[in-house]
């Protein structure tokens, strides 16, 4: 029976010999067990004093030492940070000498301080965006409130209504003439009332235009007393009579007027006055005293 079993085993695996069949093979180790054996060996080699450099990398990292700054050191660092947020190498070395610190510690402190400053700026901007535009006006940071103590934000006085036109003066037109009575007239009044109220002096005194002094007196006087005040300071104008005639015709509402005839009459009057009006002659250059074109008064040195 044994030979029959061996023959079947040889038929299945011809490379198998009798000696191999007699000695059983040990079981193959699994991958997990193999890795565990390697880790145990590495731990054992790391615990030995004469370990390799690769074993040293597995050691725990050294813990960083936290630097404790004194109040004097923090005061000096903060003062320098307010002046310069990005100090160069030489400045950091000087600060290290003053504060009895290393340059690396000073550099790290400035780096952390800048990060804190940026974070604070971002938080303030986020608060302003959330609160809208009322937040910066209601509560400012202390430096701005110290610089501008007189401004009271959020407590602006209510808008006052603009004064009426009667209270305003126009210095560029009539030397600070009060235009109260003119402004008190209705805006959309009939043409007859406008002509009667605005040109009372021209209807009473044809050919005259009131001067600045007369207009000042006219400001507070009623329309009936206006001609007496205007007659004192009058300046002649060629077109005043036509305007006076038109105003006089417009001021009498009970007389029938033909618009065509009145316009033709006013145009004829304007044409006559324009023809009779002459500008003053401009004095010309003095006549030449028998001098030829080539003679000039040239002063020659003696």
From Swiss-Prot:
Principal place of residence: nucleus
Biased composition (Basic and acidic residues): 31-43
Modified residues (Phosphoserine): 52, 57
Record keywords, A-Z: Activator, Developmental protein, DNA-binding, Homeobox, Nucleus, Phosphoprotein, Transcription, Transcription regulation
Pfam families per the UniProt record, alphabetical: Homeodomain (PF00046), OAR (PF03826)
Domain of life the protein comes from: Eukaryota
Chain location of the short sequence motif Nuclear localization signal per the record: 268-272
An annotated GO BP: regulation of gene expression
PROSITE patterns: HOMEOBOX_1 (PS00027), HOMEOBOX_2 (PS50071), OAR (PS50803)
DNA-binding region: 62-121
Tissue expression pattern: Expression is restricted to the substantia nigra and ventral tegmental area in the midbrain. Expression increases in prenatally stressed adult offspring in the ventral tegmental area, whereas no changes are observed in the substantia nigra area (at protein level).
Disordered: annotated segments: 1-71
SMART domains: HOX (SM00389)
Chain ranges for the short sequence motif OAR as given in the UniProt record: 262-275
GO cellular-component term (any): chromatin
Localization per Swiss-Prot or TrEMBL: Nucleus
One annotated GO molecular function: RNA polymerase II cis-regulatory region sequence-specific DNA binding
Function comment: Transcriptional regulator which is important for the differentiation and maintenance of meso-diencephalic dopaminergic (mdDA) neurons during development. In addition to its importance during development, it also has roles in the long-term survival and maintenance of the mdDA neurons. Activates NR4A2/NURR1-mediated transcription of genes such as SLC6A3, SLC18A2, TH and DRD2 which are essential for development of mdDA neurons.
Quaternary organization: Interacts with SFPQ.
Family: Belongs to the paired homeobox family. Bicoid subfamily.
Name of the featured protein: Pituitary homeobox 3
Source organism: Rattus norvegicus
């Amino acid at each position: 029976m044994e030979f029959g079993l061996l023959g079947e085993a040889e038929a299945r695996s011809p490379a198998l010999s009798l000696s191999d069949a007699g000695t059983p093979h040990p079981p193959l180790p699994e991958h997990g067990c193999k890795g565990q054996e390697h880790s145990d060996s590495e731990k054992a080699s790391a615990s030995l004093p004469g370990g390799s450099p690769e074993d040293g990398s597995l050691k725990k990292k050294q813990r960083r030492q936290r630097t404790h700054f004194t109040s004097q050191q923090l005061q000096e660092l903060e003062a320098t940070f307010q002046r310069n947020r990005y100090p160069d190498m030489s400045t950091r070395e000087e600060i290290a000498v003053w504060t009895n610190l290393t340059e690396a510690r000073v550099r790290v402190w400035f780096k952390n301080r800048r990060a804190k400053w940026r974070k604070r700026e971002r938080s303030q901007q986020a608060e302003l965006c959330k609160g809208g535009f009322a937040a910066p006006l209601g509560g400012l940071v202390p430096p701005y409130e110290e610089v501008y103590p007189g401004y009271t934000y959020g407590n602006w006085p209510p808008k006052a209504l603009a004064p009426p036109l009667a209270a305003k003066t126009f210095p560029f037109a009539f030397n600070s003439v009060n235009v109260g009575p003119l402004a008190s007239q209705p805006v959309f009044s009939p043409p007859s009332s406008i002509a009667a109220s605005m040109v009372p002096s021209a209807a009473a005194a044809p050919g005259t235009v009131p001067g600045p002094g007369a207009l000042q007196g006219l400001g507070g006087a009623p329309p009936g007393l206006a001609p007496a005040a205007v007659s004192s300071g009058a300046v002649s104008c060629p077109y005043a009579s036509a305007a006076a005639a038109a105003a006089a015709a417009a001021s009498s509402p009970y007389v029938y007027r033909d618009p065509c005839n009145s316009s033709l009459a006013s145009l004829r009057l304007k044409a006559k006055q324009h023809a009779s009006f002459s500008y003053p002659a401009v004095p010309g250059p003095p006549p030449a005293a028998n001098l030829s074109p080539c003679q000039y008064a040239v002063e020659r040195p003696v």
